[in-house]
């Protein structure tokens, strides 16, 4: 799999996607702010989208790009619902720290 897409080798693009995925996973595991955690999850989803598009272009199939549209729609819905929950939790608890939100009791 040593193809070149628009002058960039596929391995470079996959390496970038791996780095983005790793940064996202580290953000989810290390950070305690729920907004940063949501941003890290979005970074993970975007790195997966990059892999889908890369393989779609390298193999000359449209399937990967089609899946990306569905993943983006799901990510947008997840972001909208997640941010609405974060706003509701912040209004009630006055904090976005995950450690302070251990119980789901109001």
Curated annotation (Swiss-Prot):
Instruction: Give the family from UniProt.
Output: Belongs to the complex I subunit 4L family.
SUBUNIT field: NDH-1 is composed of 14 different subunits. Subunits NuoA, H, J, K, L, M, N constitute the membrane sector of the complex.
Give the GO cellular component terms, alphabetically: NADH dehydrogenase complex; plasma membrane
What does it do? Answer: NDH-1 shuttles electrons from NADH, via FMN and iron-sulfur (Fe-S) centers, to quinones in the respiratory chain. The immediate electron acceptor for the enzyme in this species is believed to be ubiquinone. Couples the redox reaction to proton translocation (for every two electrons transferred, four hydrogen ions are translocated across the cytoplasmic membrane), and thus conserves the redox energy in a proton gradient.
| Name of the protein in question | NADH-quinone oxidoreductase subunit K
Annotated compartments: Cell inner membrane
Instruction: Name one process (GO BP) from the record.
Output: ATP synthesis coupled electron transport
Keyword presence, Ubl conjugation:
no
């Amino acid at each position: 799999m040593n193809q070149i897409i628009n002058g960039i080798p596929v391995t470079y693009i996959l390496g970038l996607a791996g780095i983005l995925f790793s940064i996202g996973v580290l953000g989810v595991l290390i950070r305690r702010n729920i907004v940063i955690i949501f941003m890290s999850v979005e970074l993970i989803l975007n790195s997966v989208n990059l892999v889908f598009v890369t393989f779609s272009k390298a193999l000359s199939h449209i399937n990967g790009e089609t899946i990306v549209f569905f993943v983006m729609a799901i990510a947008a819905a997840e972001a909208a619902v997640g941010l609405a929950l974060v706003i509701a939790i912040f209004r009630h608890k006055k904090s976005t720290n995950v450690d302070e939100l251990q119980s789901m009791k109001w």
